[in-house]
């Protein structure tokens, strides 16, 4: 494809000036997609492009390729490595090393998936083109699994210092947070956490983190305390199990304060402002409200979250686009790694059937299941599971939950087995 020369650029600039804003936008979009290099040769078979190499996206890419070897499957992910957020509180607490959570995409590529380490800049759904930092890709089916962004603006004073306060709910942010915790071991003081109202990624995650950080302080003999400011009236998942652990195990290391909203942050004075007054901190791990990644809004698939067509994972605005993982907003599913993984399997089967010639109306709905283990110390865990069914008459998804709030070593063993099983299915056995 020819490159723009100087004369073409000058002509384009003159046209933009003369035509006005609307015309310039249309022209820019046309040139944006018409001129950049293609990342791959023109496809000779159906192409499935997956944006995001997390729990959901990696699963979709690998499973579609396994089920439809003749299809071209492309996985676009800016990071060269995968890090699991589920089980990451064990790393923060010092129970497990970082390598326990990290995998490469070697086996995914060996399966025949094309791995493109790029960042997605835009998507033209009319022309079925994905624009990345290196060029563009045409697709037949698109899977969006880009994860979440933080709403720093919801807490006045946070956005200006976000680089100083890693949240630890996106992959690899945990490394900086762990370094800060290591320094806190030496100073002690107040380790203030904030938990927002849902929806956010991994509902039990902050409560597990609070317990494991309290375990860390207790085990290391750090003269400090974890102060948990919760916007909710109680833990939003497995409340009896978490509260029992806080009271039984960490009376001197953890203070849990429910019904408390943050109204601002003064980082210079090391104070969190709340409706009940200021709370001083030595180290803060403040979890802001969350939203779907920016690409969702940029391409017109939603605002805070993107909506699907229940009971399927198809975008309500585009039947060539699937939405997987934490970005969806109109289902009762928690934003968990397990839901992303299971829905990734479901989406892969759905796409495979469409590639095989089935119409949408011919494909019966599949709904995910969920299980979530939460550690409360280095050896014990609690869990919750969810099963979902489709009520055709009511046109809605129904949920049924089972909870084990009794912490036990058996649950801990099950948690490790669960994680290892899913990681192996996504990335193959460890070398």
Regions found by a protein language model. Give the residues of each.
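Glycine-rich, N-terminal phosphate-binding loop of Rossmann-like dinucleotide-binding domains
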Residues: 13, 134, 146-147, 288-289
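FAD-site-proximal beta/loop scaffold in flavoenzymes
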Residues: 160-185, 280-342, 353
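Internal hydrophobic alpha-helix adjacent to the cofactor/substrate pocket in enzyme cavities
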Residues: 340-364
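A Rossmann-like FAD-binding core segment of flavoenzymes
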Residues: 113-122, 130, 137, 215-304
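N-terminal secretory signal peptides and thylakoid transit peptides that target proteins
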Residues: 1-17
